């Protein structure tokens, strides 16, 4: 499984510590399946939270759209599964899904 950084978002918590969420495209080149991974790190603490869903779709276009939505809405690892589910549901309702 290959992992490629697609973007980052920074924010400060209630104790004024900088948090950085990194968004990765995961690719299984053998089976042409794409997924997503998120990692949240904090200054002076390193990696503090992560999650991944390695098998989401077989479409690079769909996974790129999903990752861009995750970045836009500053999704953190703890809400990754719920957020992906919401994105997929909305696309199906709009008739735009290729999944």
Predicted regions and their residues:
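Negatively charged, low-complexity tracts enriched in Asp/Glu with abundant Ser/Thr
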Residues: 1-22
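Long, contiguous N-terminal structural blocks used for assembly/anchoring
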Residues: 4-7, 26, 96-99
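Intrinsically disordered, low-complexity N-terminal regions enriched in serine/proline/glycine
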Residues: 11, 22-23, 33, 72
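A positively charged, amphipathic N-terminal helix/segment that binds anionic biomolecules
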Residues: 18-28, 95
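A short, structured beta-strand/loop element
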Residues: 30-52
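Mixed-charge, Lys/Arg-enriched low-complexity segments
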Residues: 44-99
């Amino acid at each position: 499984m290959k992992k490629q950084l697609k973007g980052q978002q920074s924010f400060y918590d209630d104790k004024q510590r900088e948090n950085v969420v990194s968004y990765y495209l995961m690719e299984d080149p053998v089976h042409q399946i794409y997924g997503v991974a998120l990692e949240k790190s904090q200054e002076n603490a390193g990696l503090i939270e992560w999650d991944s869903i390695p098998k989401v779709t077989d479409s690079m276009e769909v996974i790129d759209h999903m990752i861009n939505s995750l970045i836009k809405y500053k999704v953190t690892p703890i809400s990754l599964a719920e957020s992906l589910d919401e994105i997929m549901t909305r696309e199906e309702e709009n008739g735009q899904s290729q999944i």
